A protein has these predicted regions:
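Bacterial N-terminal signal peptides that target proteins for export
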Residues: 1-7
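C-terminal region of N-terminal signal peptides and the immediate post-cleavage residues
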Residues: 15-27
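OB-fold and OB-like single-stranded nucleic-acid-recognition modules
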Residues: 24-194
Length: 194
């Protein structure tokens, strides 16, 4: 009886090691490794995910940057911007891997906007549009390059869609001044440049 239990333990251990070695993530998504306390909003895994309209509204990076932002960063989806998918065309000026995803800096006609593609390992079973988000990651990384934690220039032109997200208001170059982002990115078409 003890021998059977030992054999089962070894088989389970080998299966876990094989899954880890093959690149499959075995850890459960969490705030510590997937973008902080708002990771559920950032991955479309939050309680309000079903209220998001996934059919994108076409707009511009500049128009998103002009939207009135909430006084505090919302912890739940309470604004129209957060309950809508948006589609813009822009140039990816640079990108980098950061906690929980791949941050793209988009530029068009003098305006900037950040868009974030979550790491596939940060998508939970509750993530809405999970296959689409994972496909965006695969397409961008497969077509462009392998991301690192350092900023990398790119110059690719993309038609990109994502869910509205309010982050911290930033005064740095490359971010929308009102804190608006597309997070998560749910669709991407690389027009040129990768």
């Amino acid at each position: 009886m003890k021998r059977t239990g030992f054999i089962v333990l070894i088989v389970v251990g080998l299966a876990t090691a094989a899954a880890t070695a093959s690149g499959h993530e075995t850890a459960t998504p969490n705030a510590a490794r997937c973008g902080g306390t708002l990771w559920r909003l950032k991955t479309l895994s939050d309680i309000g995910r079903r209220r998001v309209r996934l059919t994108p509204e076409v707009t511009t990076i500049g128009d998103i940057g002009k939207r009135a932002s909430p006084r505090l960063v919302p912890r739940v989806r309470r604004t129209h911007f957060q309950r809508q998918a948006w589609k813009v065309v822009g140039q990816v000026t640079q990108y980098r891997l950061e906690n929980g995803g791949l941050r793209l800096v988009l530029y068009d006609a003098g305006s900037y906007l950040n868009a974030v593609i979550p790491l596939p390992s940060c998508l939970s079973a509750k993530t809405r549009a999970r296959p689409q988000i994972a496909a965006v990651w695969k397409q961008f990384v497969g077509a462009c390059t392998h991301p690192t934690s350092s900023w990398q220039p790119l110059g690719a032109i993309v038609d990109i869609g994502g869910i509205g997200f309010w982050g911290q208001k930033r005064t740095i170059k490359g971010a929308a001044p009102n804190g608006a982002e597309l997070h998560p990115v749910t669709d991407i078409r690389i027009v040129a440049g990768c």
